[in-house]
């Protein structure tokens, strides 16, 4: 099975249908993006189902009947078709279902997908077909979205501290909506992009989140009025307020409290005769806990309706919500070492029954897809591709590189493995591929696309 490179990503299952690709992508190159094409105009008139059908053909998305084929069977069927020692199975059906749930729970909140979470071509194209907008944090992310044929009005440049070169690029391609949180940024924008539409990012209480951003981004509520006054003096257009409660948010109160802060900024702006029309509630949405998601979205629905008039546009920046559950990583054991109790070195473990311990070396590690264990607080669980009747034994899972910190999981227990056995890890779609490197020459795994939603259901989107 062969793969091709697109935006730096290896996409497998390519059917190499150039006509379909041209129709779907609506690709004028970025430096030609000011020219409207017949293809992009006609494509915009297609239904969601028709757009998804084009995307599925381009990515060669295979149907997956989960009632008949388990994830283990699906992975096993791919082993004879690839020579790679690690690969992803991506279910676009998960992304579609997450979008349906979003529309049901937050019908008045427009999602701007956080590209940094998973910038792969499959995820971006499926979300584009569904009508999702994009949160970009860099020139490269903006380029990747514009290359889909996305109108620049569907992008928010949500990085409060931007490079001058990136500001110039955004201006050249009419990406106007962007965040700021300090005077220096206002001065840059005044000089290099004075027509920009600005969103003031405030610092909410993010103490109830796993990953907090308040120490780096967001202006304190007491300093908001001064920044608004400065923007007005510079004749810059401030259109709204944003916040981010942090990744892995644990309480809906964080959104409620932040929205109350946003309302106070709206009141400040009103006294300065500045009309704000946009609220960006940021990210922090879970992709796997429906109960928590339902609770958070209820708070957002009720609080935005209570605090803001209907003409105020509400947007959000979900990332892991769409991507996390969509990807499963399959990885093989490339080496194995038996460890004596007295020779367990950096990863000591003592067992009461002198059970043998093992070091297993996997084809992917923390410099690759498992970087989420270091930077995203992910808890990964190794699952056996083939069932085993053996008793679990103590072990440590290492990645393939020559660095000793390349430890995927230490002091765990799984049945004894042999070289060539396969493990798989679920919920690996968020902050894995995006942050992986080619350290030691180990390239990121390819992605195989499938769809678990029946055709009849897709027709009703």
From Swiss-Prot:
Cofactor annotation: pyridoxal 5'-phosphate
Active-site positions on this chain: 402
EC number: 4.1.1.17
Binding site for pyridoxal 5'-phosphate: 247, 284, 317-320, 431
Pfam families, A to Z: Orn_Arg_deC_N, Orn_DAP_Arg_deC
A single GO molecular function term of this UniProt record: ornithine decarboxylase activity
Keywords tagged on the record: Decarboxylase, Lyase, Polyamine biosynthesis, Pyridoxal phosphate
Superkingdom of origin organism: Eukaryota
Chain intervals with Low complexity compositional bias: 13-22
UniProt record, GO biological process: putrescine biosynthetic process; putrescine biosynthetic process from arginine, via ornithine
Cross-referenced InterPro entries: Ala_racemase/Decarboxylase_C (IPR009006), De-COase2_C (IPR022643), De-COase2_N (IPR022644), De-COase2_pyr-phos_BS (IPR022653), Orn/DAP/Arg_de-COase (IPR000183), Orn_de-COase (IPR002433), PLP-binding_barrel (IPR029066)
Residues recorded with modification N6-(pyridoxal phosphate)lysine: 116
Annotated catalysed reactions: L-ornithine + H(+) = putrescine + CO2
Gene Ontology CC terms: cytoplasm; cytoplasmic vesicle
Pathway terms, separated by semicolons: Amine and polyamine biosynthesis; putrescine biosynthesis via L-ornithine pathway; putrescine from L-ornithine: step 1/1
UniProt biased composition (Basic and acidic residues): 23-32
Regulation acting on activity, per entry: Inhibited by antizyme (AZ) in response to polyamine levels. AZ inhibits the assembly of the functional homodimer by binding to ODC monomers and targeting them for ubiquitin-independent proteolytic destruction by the 26S proteasome.
Chain sites annotated for binding substrate: 375-376, 403
Annotated spans, Disordered: 1-35
Site residues (Stacks against the aromatic ring of pyridoxal phosphate and stabilizes reaction intermediates), renumbered to this chain: 244
Enzyme class: lyase
Alphabetical list of CDD domains matching this protein: PLPDE_III_ODC
Quaternary organization: Homodimer. Only the dimer is catalytically active, as the active sites are constructed of residues from both monomers.
Similarity section: Belongs to the Orn/Lys/Arg decarboxylase class-II family.
Summary of the function given for this chain in its UniProt record: Catalyzes the first and rate-limiting step of polyamine biosynthesis that converts ornithine into putrescine, which is the precursor for the polyamines, spermidine and spermine. Polyamines are essential for cell proliferation and are implicated in cellular processes, ranging from DNA replication to apoptosis.
Name listed for the protein in its UniProt record: Probable ornithine decarboxylase
Species this protein is from: Dictyostelium discoideum
């Amino acid at each position: 099975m062969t793969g091709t490179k697109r935006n730096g990503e290896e996409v497998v299952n390519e059917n190499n249908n150039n006509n379909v690709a041209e129709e779907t992508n609506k690709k004028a190159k970025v430096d030609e993006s000011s020219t409207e094409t017949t293809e992009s105009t006609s494509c915009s008139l297609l239904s969601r189902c028709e757009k998804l059908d084009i995307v599925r053909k381009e990515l060669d998305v295979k149907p997956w009947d989960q009632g008949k084929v388990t994830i283990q069977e699906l992975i096993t069927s791919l082993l004879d078709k690839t020579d790679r020692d690690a690969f992803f199975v991506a279910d676009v059906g998960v992304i579609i279902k997450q979008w349906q749930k979003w529309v049901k729970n937050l019908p008045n909140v427009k999602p701007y997908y956080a590209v940094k979470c998973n910038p792969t071509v499959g995820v971006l194209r499926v979300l584009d077909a569904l009508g999702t907008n994009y949160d970009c944090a860099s020139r490269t992310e903006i380029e990747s979205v514009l290359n889909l044929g996305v109108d620049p009005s569907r992008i928010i440049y949500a990085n409060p501290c931007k490079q001058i070169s990136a500001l110039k690029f955004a201006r050249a391609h009419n990406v106007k909506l962007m965040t700021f949180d300090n005077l220096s940024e206002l001065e840059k924008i005044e000089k290099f992009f004075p027509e920009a539409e600005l969103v003031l990012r405030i610092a909410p209480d993010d103490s109830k989140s796993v990953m907090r951003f308040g120490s780096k981004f967001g202006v304190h509520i007491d300093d908001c009025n001064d920044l608004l006054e400065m923007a007005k003096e510079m004749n810059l257009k401030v259109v709204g307020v944003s916040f981010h409660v942090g990744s892995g948010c644990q309480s809906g109160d964080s959104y409620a409290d932040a929205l109350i802060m946003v309302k106070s900024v709206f009141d400040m702006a009103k006294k300065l005769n500045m009309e704000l029309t946009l609220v960006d509630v940021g990210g922090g949405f879970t992709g796997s806990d429906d109960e928590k998601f339902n609770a958070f979205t209820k708070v957002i629905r009720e609080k935005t309706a209570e605090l803001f008039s209907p003409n105020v546009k509400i947007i959000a920046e979900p990332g892991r919500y769409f991507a996390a559950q969509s990807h499963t990583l399959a990885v093989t054991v490339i080496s194995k070492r038996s460890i004596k109790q007295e020779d367990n070195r950096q990863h000591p473990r003592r067992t009461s029954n002198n059970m043998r311990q093992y070091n297993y070396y996997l084809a992917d590690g923390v410099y690759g897809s498992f970087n989420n264990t270091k930077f995203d607080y992910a808890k990964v669980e190794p699952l056996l591709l083939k069932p085993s009747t053996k008793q679990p034994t103590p072990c440590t899972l290492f990645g393939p590189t020559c660095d000793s910190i390349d430890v995927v999981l230490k002091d765990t227990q799984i049945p004894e493995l042999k070289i060539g056995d396969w493990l798989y890890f679920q919920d690996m779609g968020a902050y894995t591929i995006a942050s992986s490197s080619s350290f030691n020459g180990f390239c990121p795994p390819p992605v195989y696309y499938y769809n678990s939603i029946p055709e009849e259901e897709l027709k009703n989107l």
